Amino acid sequence: MEDEDVPVCWICNEELGNERFRACGCTGELENVHRSCLSTWLTISRNTACQICGVVYNTRVVWRPLREMTLLPRLTYQEGLELIVFIFIMTLGAAGLAAATWVWLYIVGGHDPEIDHVAAAAYYVFFVFYQLFVVFGLGAFFHMMRHVGRAYAAVNTRVEVFPYRPRPTSPECAVEEIELQEILPRGDNQDEEGPAGAAPGDQNGPAGAAPGDQDGPADGAPVHRDSEESVDEAAGYKEAGEPTHNDGRDDNVEPTAVGCDCNNLGAERYRATYCGGYVGAQSGDGAYSVSCHNKAGPSSLVDILPQGLPGGGYGSMGVIRKRSAVSSALMFH
């Protein structure tokens, strides 16, 4: 029974000992492997990812020492033929370049030229076309011989593998990093009588309710109620990126950072954004803001839908509370 509990390498089936190494996200028996065995297997197979969990290996390709290199790897018939033609064209190009240079220096450009100007012009034209043929021919064969070069590199290189470093799966902005803050009170027409302990904003809420109760906001809290015209104007935000609505009736009220499409969901109209870690939402008769401490990520625009439905489908999770229940959820990547 003890022998079965000893971890063994899934490649060579030998005990790991102190050479235990994890290279991918596999667990169980497939987690145990020798680093040298995996390096040899990746060098031969040239795989870049685990075929089971799909994790890309953390590897590095290095060239073997010069004394260990193989000058002529084992090639197929087609690869050998292409190699012979390539060597022939290389030799032809080098010989032609040497001959053209010699003619140009000693026959055409010498002190006593042996050809006239017409023959020299013809020679120049031939030299230009010959060099173009050699250059384009070499380029074509270089393109055709990519797999030959890969075969040579596969024989003379080896793969070094490094430990697996899993990426964090937790969202960038966790729920505990979200602050919920009511920045504008709700209207009187939306709150009804509620039981004791109702959330701030109910008509008959408990003592010490937050600003937004019927009795009025706390001292110093900005008061701003949207009229029917402003609610209708809120539905006119067609393009994401337009600034949110602020009709200027209260200079102390600042609009949210960026506005999105305003969804007409009956009495619930929201527009929200996640911009550098800040989330702002505004309804037809009140406004809320959600501040995220994690100032990370590019600007992403989202819509907030009621009943916890993700509007924009973007990243980390935050919630916007209305009354005593969670009526909206913000999901953004």
Curated annotation (Swiss-Prot):
Organism field: Human herpesvirus 8 type P (isolate GK18) (HHV-8)
GO molecular function terms noted in the UniProt entry: transferase activity; zinc ion binding
GO biological processes: endocytosis involved in viral entry into host cell; protein ubiquitination; symbiont-mediated perturbation of host ubiquitin-like protein modification; symbiont-mediated suppression of host adaptive immune response; symbiont-mediated suppression of host innate immune response; symbiont-mediated suppression of host type I interferon-mediated signaling pathway; ubiquitin-dependent protein catabolic process
UniProt binding sites for Zn(2+) 2: 24, 26, 50, 53
EC number: 2.3.2.36
Chain positions recorded as Zn(2+) 1 binding sites: 9, 12, 34, 37
Pathway(s) annotated for this protein in UniProt: Protein modification; protein ubiquitination
Chain positions covered by the region annotation Disordered: 187-257
Gene Ontology CC, one term: membrane
Name of the protein in question: E3 ubiquitin-protein ligase MIR1
Transmembrane segments: 83-103, 122-142
Cytoplasmic side: 1-82, 143-333
Keywords: Early protein, Host cell membrane, Host endoplasmic reticulum, Host membrane, Host-virus interaction, Inhibition of host innate immune response by virus, Inhibition of host interferon receptors by virus, Inhibition of host interferon signaling pathway by virus, Interferon antiviral system evasion, Membrane, Metal-binding, Transferase, Transmembrane, Transmembrane helix, Ubl conjugation pathway, Viral immunoevasion, Zinc, Zinc-finger
Catalytic activity: [E2 ubiquitin-conjugating enzyme]-S-ubiquitinyl-L-cysteine + [acceptor protein]-L-cysteine = [E2 ubiquitin-conjugating enzyme]-L-cysteine + [acceptor protein]-S-ubiquitinyl-L-cysteine
PROSITE patterns associated with the record: ZF_RING_CH
Keyword Transferase: yes
Biased composition (Low complexity): 195-221
CDD domains the UniProt entry points to: RING_CH-C4HC3_MARCH (cd16495)
Major location category of this protein: host cell
Subcellular location: Host cell membrane; Host endoplasmic reticulum
Biased composition range(s): Basic and acidic residues: 235-252
